[in-house]
UniProtKB/Swiss-Prot annotation:
GO CC aspect terms: cytoplasm; ribosome
Subunit structure: Binds ribosomal protein uS19.
GO BP, one annotated term: ribosomal small subunit biogenesis
Pfam families per UniProt: PRC (PF05239), RimM (PF01782)
Name of the featured protein: Ribosome maturation factor RimM
Domain PRC barrel: 94-163
GO molecular function, one term: ribosome binding
Organism (species): Rickettsia akari (strain Hartford)
Similarity section: Belongs to the RimM family.
Regions crossing the membrane: none
Domain remark from Swiss-Prot or TrEMBL: The PRC barrel domain binds ribosomal protein uS19.
Amino acid sequence: MNSLENLILVGVIKSCHGIKGHVILKSFTEPATKILAKNLVNESREDIHIQLISQNAKGELICRFNDITTRNEAENLKGYKIFCLRASLPEPAEDEFYIADLNHLPVLDPNHKEIGKIKNILNFGAGDIIEIEFLDQTTELLPFNKEFFPVITKDYVTLNYQRGV
């Protein structure tokens, strides 16, 4: 079993904050503080215990780990990924989904012909971007919105996009 199988990425440490070992946590939950209600683990599935200190104007959480007390220790956490077990999450409503569940789904054109698969979901701060690997092995990055992806199910997504136009 892949070490990340059945894990959902729910946050990442962006940087340290101050001199007492606090960190800035970018939460992928909505609202951001909902991450703290989850049983959190690292990539090795070891439990993580985080305490909220405050929330900044960008919606990022300023937190502390129980065993991190200095800025130097906190600096080593930059890029540290925080997960929860997929089984610990509630099933999404019929018209909802978890972004992580989209990975590797088939991509269909509007005529329901398979044209590729979702290779990756990215976010550089301006919204989710879907990386599509087409059947000819080329890839394209497209914004994740209803204009490009009018149908999203647990089994496939429909892409409303003509390549090369």
